[in-house]
Curated annotation (Swiss-Prot):
This is Large ribosomal subunit protein bL12. Homodimer. Part of the ribosomal stalk of the 50S ribosomal subunit. Forms a multimeric L10(L12)X complex, where L10 forms an elongated spine to which 2 to 4 L12 dimers bind in a sequential fashion. Binds GTP-bound translation factors. GO terms for biological process: translation. It comes from Thermotoga neapolitana (strain ATCC 49049 / DSM 4359 / NBRC 107923 / NS-E). The gene is rplL. Belongs to the bacterial ribosomal protein bL12 family. HAMAP family: Ribosomal_bL12 (MF_00368).
Amino acid sequence: MTIDEIVEAIEKLTVSELAELVKKLEDKFGVTAAAPVAVAAAPVAGAAGAAQEEKTEFDVILKSFGQNKVQVIKVVREITGLGLKEAKDLVEKAGTPDAVIKSGVSKEEAEEIKKKLEEAGAEVELK
């Protein structure tokens, strides 16, 4: 029997026969129907979408220091108050998840930091 033939046979079943088929498949293979999981997951996705729309705190992440590493280090020191070695180490982490220049800042402050870093030649991402 081909898959198409199986689908045709399933299409001809009544609702009660489909319910019985699902029950037998669950018992036979030790699984449960996925529909309740999908229904439960839907509100979570909606909540995540709402949270993104209302985002008020941002992380400033250095993606690349570009051609002018020294200038980017100077700007990072100015923004963060780090020492020279710490700022250099942070700039050299560009492109990694650890390259967070500042976290939990307002949108305005994040945009200002991004502008300063981009003027120094860096590539920056706001999350």
